[in-house]
Swiss-Prot record:
Ranges for domain Globin: 2-146
Transmembrane segments: none
Species of origin: Urocitellus townsendii
Gene Ontology CC entries for this record: blood microparticle; haptoglobin-hemoglobin complex; hemoglobin complex
Modified residues (Phosphoserine): 44
Protein name as annotated: Hemoglobin subunit beta-S/F
Length: 146
């Protein structure tokens, strides 16, 4: 992902203002509610029968933290997203058989949740930069599929 210094600064500033675990839990929860077909990958998570069940589910929150920790690590390696996410791409392709389109959907959920948490502090410039990053991460996670 090619980012200008201004975009890198916008990402760093915005990311520094959020609780990553909350962002991850809410983003994954929203993905499962808004796109219910994604729930099939999480059969072992227990009750996902309603929005409140999903958003309150401890396993969703824990996996959301795991997802966002990987995303956060990617923010430290923006010049090598494919390398950073190579093993996760392989896992999701070969073992879990996740539709790579879901990575784009989750990326959009991350941006939506960031906007919700940061309000006016999530400037259009920050959003534009994050959209580039989530697209780059989705592409890196989809790399093994090609």
């Amino acid at each position: 992902v090619h980012l200008t210094d201004g975009e890198k600064n916008a990402i760093s500033t915005a990311w520094g203002k959020v609780n990553a675990a909350e962002i991850g839990a809410e983003a994954l929860g929203r993905l499962l509610v808004v796109y219910p077909w994604t729930q099939r990958f999480f059969d072992s998570f227990g009750d996902l029968s309603s929005a409140s069940a999903v958003m309150g589910n401890a396993k969703v929150k824990a996996h959301g933290k795991k997802v966002i920790d990987s995303f956060s690590n990617g923010l430290k390696h923006l010049d090598n997203l494919k390398g950073t996410f190579a093993s996760l791409s392989e896992l999701h392709c070969d073992k879990l058989h996740v539709d790579p389109e879901n990575f784009k959907l989750l990326g959009n959920m991350i941006v939506i949740v960031m906007a919700h948490h940061l309000g006016k502090d999530f400037t259009p410039e920050a959003q534009a930069a994050f959209q580039k990053v989530v697209a780059g991460v989705a592409n890196a996670l989809s790399h093994k599929y090609h």
